């Protein structure tokens, strides 16, 4: 995040977006409630001289930024890493809401993040080990199943 307002942090990829568009993106990213609880809402300063955000709040602002940009391809790299369970669930719900109508590439060690993906590619030692849906990979009984069972 940048040392600027919440509004400007969300619109960095699409300057000039209306407040209504920013609010819609924040709602889809499950960020609107914590933003409106801040002293100046969307005009609250963030960063060194402003409000400090939790990891989950930062992730949800990043998701709002992606939503407002409306990319055809979205890359999410460890979107739920280092989050507590509540924040992880909130970020996962936000991700689920923005998946439709675009190609999303997710890099994740937490398999719960990719469980609903159309296709999962499992890498091991720098190579492709398995590919399939969550259900197909569990039935296969290989690397993915072992990792999934270790995490649940």
List each model region and its residues:
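ABC-family ATPase nucleotide-binding domain "signature/switch" substructure
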Residues: 4-9, 16, 23-31, 41-143
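ABC ATPase nucleotide-binding domains
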Residues: 149-152
């Amino acid at each position: 995040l940048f040392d600027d307002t919440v509004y400007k942090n969300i619109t960095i990829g699409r300057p000039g977006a209306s407040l209504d568009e920013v609010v819609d993106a924040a709602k889809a990213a499950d960020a609107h409630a914590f933003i409106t609880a801040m002293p100046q809402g969307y005009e609250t300063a963030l960063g060194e001289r402003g409000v400090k955000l939790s990891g989950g709040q930062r992730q949800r602002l990043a998701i709002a930024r992606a939503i407002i940009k409306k990319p055809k391809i979205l890359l999410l790299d460890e979107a739920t890493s280092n989050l507590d369970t509540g924040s992880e669930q909130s970020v996962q719900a936000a991700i689920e809401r923005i998946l439709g109508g675009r190609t999303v590439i997710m890099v994740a060690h937490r398999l719960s993040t990719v469980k609903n993906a159309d296709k999962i590619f499992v890498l091991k030692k720098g190579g492709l080990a398995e590919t399939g849906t969550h259900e197909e990979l569990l039935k296969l009984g290989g690397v993915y199943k072992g990792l999934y069972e270790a995490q649940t």
